[in-house]
Amino acid sequence: MGEAAEGSLRLVIADDHPLFRGALREAVLGRHADATIEEVGTFDELTALLERDRDFDLILLDLTMPGARGFSGLIYLRAQYTSLPVVVVSGNEESAVIRRCMDLGASGFIPKTMSVAAMREAVAGVLGGETFVPSDISLAARADAETDAIISRLATLTPQQVRVLMMLSEGRLNKQIAYELSVSEATVKAHVSAILQKLSVESRTQAVIAVSKVEAGLWSQSQA
């Protein structure tokens, strides 16, 4: 995606910390003074916003904001809005986490410890069609073959199937999922069957385990 024309840039900052949202806003406005910036503090607010209006140039996403667990928010956004770039912003700067975000389709990763000036350059690079990760991170070190295979299979899920899978991971029953998605239990069962087939597993439990392997060892500490 080419960089948006001056004055037409539209971004979403999705983070539950107002002070950090302010820092990101400053970083963006320092380069694009006329940018339109929407701010949300929960993942539910983000999805509601995008259901109303998906005409944005970039999403700046906090991995661990309320309503998102681990990589679930990123996985959902990449499935639902394939052409909308997502840059992850996080206090978890483990190299494995950064690489996994890129594996899952992020356009960049901005550590929360970066200066506003550095954030400004990172955002500008992504808007110019580049990817961004901290200079000391090598993307050459890949996940193991099994995890790579799971990530590839996750990419085949439809947006609704991703939502169902995330709810399964939270321990919800078909009845609860049906209520939340405003669909019938039969529809949920059909989604679950499709998920099992696409992930090459035989049970709901195995599907949840498959997702957990993507996150294994990466979230041992609670970090914003």
Could you say what each language-model-derived stretch is?
Residues 42, 69-72:
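Acidic catalytic/metal-coordinating carboxylates
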